[in-house]
A protein has these predicted regions:
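Surface-exposed, charge/polar-rich loops and edge strands
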Residues: 126, 130, 160, 170-177, ...
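Signal peptide processing junction and immediate N-terminal pro/mature segment
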Residues: 24-28
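N-terminal secretory signal peptides and thylakoid transit peptides that target proteins
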Residues: 1-14
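Beta-strand elements within well-structured catalytic alpha/beta cores of enzymes
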Residues: 40-44, 73-78, 165, 185-198, ...
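Internal, conserved structured core segments that host functional sites
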Residues: 121-175
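A short aromatic-anchored loop/beta-hairpin motif
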Residues: 30-136
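Short catalytic/ligand-binding loop motif for oxyanion handling, primarily in non-cytosolic enzymes
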Residues: 51-52, 82-86, 144, 199-206, ...
Length: 289
């Protein structure tokens, strides 16, 4: 058994198996269900494609979505799309991006025909121009698994207009600035979602949670609760165990973008989902506001 098979087996045993039901495609939002409520900004742990096999995790994400006002649209920033200049994804329903390898065939049969969000795309362009941020279009780029997996849990009817935006690289200050540029969207009924993992070391999957993973998880929770932006942006030198928790950084920085999109330091920070999967992967997810 090679390392990929071992990793997949360990993640499989960490999740409670179930069969994910297919979802019904929708043509778009019904006007009567739209809202312009001020939205929170969230960061969520998106798991792997196998998250859809975890009854508990699926239910937690759905309950979280149900507890928030229903957004007019979702702006998704996933760990699995890092491109410079910043790129805007498809504004129509296009095939998903199955950006993973070596999984059973059924994971490549998952569909999520969410409607595009062309109006949101236009608004994001305005905000990026106003912030002097270069951007480009990737008109055929569909949702990757860091986007469609949690969306399928939270909005299973696939009726939520969704736009994916790339990360602008992995520099913390640059990512935070992009979040700041997008901040007005939350006042316009748009749910901004950063999708990743606060710890992401696939070589350290185990039955037990290592001390370094628990320590890092506790550290980032404290930093976010205290609104310590300096520590957040300097996490690579300040965070305990960072070299073990984050051999690479693409899964962490979406939380920096999410925090950047919340200008009011007095808004509540909560953790709707916590705990670990695969030993070292924290499921901690964050709501700002």
């Amino acid at each position: 058994m090679n390392r990929r098979d071992v990793l997949r087996l360990m993640l499989t045993t960490a999740l409670a198996a179930t069969i994910w039901p297919g979802s019904k495609a929708a043509s778009g939002l019904v006007e009567g269900r739209m809202t312009k409520s001020t939205m929170p900004v969230i960061f969520l742990a998106h798991g792997s494609p196998m998250l859809l096999d975890s009854r508990r995790w699926v239910a937690e994400l759905k309950q979280w979505a149900d507890a928030m006002p229903r957004p007019r649209a979702v702006l998704m920033v996933s760990a699995h799309w890092d491109q410079r200049p910043v790129a805007l994804g498809a504004t129509r329903t296009v095939p998903l991006v199955y950006d993973f390898y070596g999984f059973p065939d059924r994971y490549y049969q998952v569909t999520y025909p969410a409607p595009g969000a062309p109006e949101l795309s236009s608004r994001v362009r305005e905000l990026l121009k106003g912030a002097n941020t270069d951007f480009m279009d990737e008109a055929d780029r569909g949702l990757d698994h860091g986007a469609y997996v949690p969306m399928k849990c939270m909005y299973p009817e696939a009726d939520m207009p969704t736009l994916q935006l790339s990360l602008p690289g992995l520099d913390p200050a640059t990512v935070y600035a992009l979040g700041q540029a997008l901040a007005p969207l939350r006042e316009e009924g748009i749910l901004i979602i950063g999708s990743g993992f606060l710890t992401h070391n696939l070589r350290a999957l185990s039955a037990e949670t290592p001390a370094w993973a628990a320590e890092f998880d506790g550290w980032i929770a404290d930093v976010l609760l205290r609104n310590d932006i300096d520590a957040l942006l300097d996490y690579r030198t300040r965070a305990p165990g960072v070299q073990y928790a984050l051999p690479t950084h693409e899964h962490f920085v979406p939380v920096i973008l999410a925090k950047g999109a919340v200008s009011d330091a007095h808004l509540a920070t909560t953790f709707p989902i916590t705990g670990f999967v695969g030993g070292s992967l924290t499921r901690r997810s964050v709501q700002f506001g």
